[in-house]
Curated annotation (Swiss-Prot):
<dbReference type="InterPro" id="IPR000971">
    <property type="entry name" value="Globin"/>
</dbReference>
<feature type="binding site" description="proximal binding residue">
    <location>
        <position position="113"/>
    </location>
    <ligand>
        <name>heme b</name>
    </ligand>
</feature>
<keyword id="KW-0732">Signal</keyword>
<dbReference type="InterPro" id="IPR044399">
    <property type="entry name" value="Mb-like_M"/>
</dbReference>
<keyword id="KW-0964">Secreted</keyword>
<dbReference type="Pfam" id="PF00042">
    <property type="entry name" value="Globin"/>
</dbReference>
<keyword id="KW-0561">Oxygen transport</keyword>
<dbReference type="InterPro" id="IPR012292">
    <property type="entry name" value="Globin/Proto"/>
</dbReference>
<comment type="similarity">
    <text>Belongs to the globin family.</text>
</comment>
<dbReference type="InterPro" id="IPR012085">
    <property type="entry name" value="Globin_nematode"/>
</dbReference>
<dbReference type="GO" id="GO:0005506">
    <property type="term" value="F:iron ion binding"/>
</dbReference>
<feature type="domain" description="Globin">
    <location>
        <begin position="17"/>
        <end position="166"/>
    </location>
</feature>
<keyword id="KW-0479">Metal-binding</keyword>
<dbReference type="GO" id="GO:0005344">
    <property type="term" value="F:oxygen carrier activity"/>
</dbReference>
<dbReference type="GO" id="GO:0019825">
    <property type="term" value="F:oxygen binding"/>
</dbReference>
<dbReference type="InterPro" id="IPR009050">
    <property type="entry name" value="Globin-like_sf"/>
</dbReference>
<protein>
    <recommendedName>
        <fullName>Globin, cuticular isoform</fullName>
    </recommendedName>
</protein>
Amino acid sequence: MLWFVAVCFAIASVSAMSPADVKKHTVESMKAVPVGRDKAQNGIDFYKFFFTHHKDLRKFFKGAENFGADDVQKSKRFEKQGTALLLAVHVLANVYDNQAVFHGFVRELMNRHEKRGVDPKLWKIFFDDVWVPFLESKGAKLSGDAKAAWKELNKNFNSEAQHQLEKLGLPHA
């Protein structure tokens, strides 16, 4: 029986990814979508992908509920919003090994989204179901470790997001 417990513990400790490893793998995969003065197209491309692959979520973008990829491409709003989103994801990946800063930034993101009526379940799926497929559409070759790192970041992000939503008195999952 003792050997069984030892094996289970060994497997659990091997499968857990350290914050430093999560940071390493997520930051590496972000090379497919850099930020910079001449990189706004990466943020626009995110919203083109998002509006094409997740049409049901356009309802959260007042005035753009019927936008398609061409509309997003021409929109100053989505140029700015895309740059902001891209920067936010870069920050989350780059500070992941500093959990106090990571959690503080997640709370700030929830504060900024407080009045937007975003379904709290969306925070649970964002990185797994939206961000990772977007990265792959941009040519990122994500290893199993990279996908596991994004899954871990997503889990931690969602946990803190739900905590903050509850604190704000908003619906939470």
